[in-house]
Amino acid sequence: MTESRKRSNKMTTKEIFDFVDSQKTAFIGSVDEDGFPNIKAMLAPRERDGNIFYFTTNTSSMRVKQYLSNPKASIYFYHRGRFRYTGVMLKGTMSVLTDQETKERIWRTGDTMFYKKGVTDPDYCVLRFTAASGRCYQDLKTESFEL
C-alpha cells in the first residue's frame, strides 16, 4: 500500500487511469450553442497516452460542430458493482483531428462499418481529449484532483 493510500482513501492517479482503461463505455460531454451540456455514450477510447484520450466519430456529427465551436469537454467512466459504484469524471478540452497520420494510427479493422470509404473517408475523424482535472466517486466519497 502506498503512503498516500494509507493516509486517505482516495484513488491514486495510476488507479484512476487503470480504472478508466478497464471500462468498455465512455460518456463524452460537449457544450451546445445555447451553453447547455450534451452527453453521449461512446465506445471506450481507442488509445490513451497519459491524460490524452483518442476517440473516433463522424466528421459530420453534431458533436464535432460543438467541439469546433467550444472545445470545453468532459468524459465520464463508471462501474456499478453489486455493492459498490465507482465513477471518474475528467474535465478538459477536445480537439478534432483530421490529419491522415492520426486517422491511420487510430483506425481499427472493422471501422468500415461506420466509415464506408475507409481510413480516408472524409466523414471519419479523431477526437483528442486532453484531461486537466477531474472528480472521482468511490465508497460514498467524492474527491477532486488535478492532472
List each language-model region with its residue ranges.
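Active-site-proximal "nucleotidyltransferase
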Residues: 2-27
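Charged, gly/pro-rich active-site loop segments
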Residues: 2-8, 88-147
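General beta-strand recognition
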Residues: 27, 52-54, 135
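Conserved beta-strand in the GNAT
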Residues: 42-43
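A generic structural signal for short beta-strands and their flanking turns/coil linkers
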Residues: 22-24, 49-51, 69-73, 84-92, ...
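A short, Trp-centered hydrophobic/proline-enriched beta-strand micro-motif
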Residues: 19-33, 73-77
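A short mixed-secondary-structure module that forms the rim of ligand-binding clefts
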Residues: 46-83
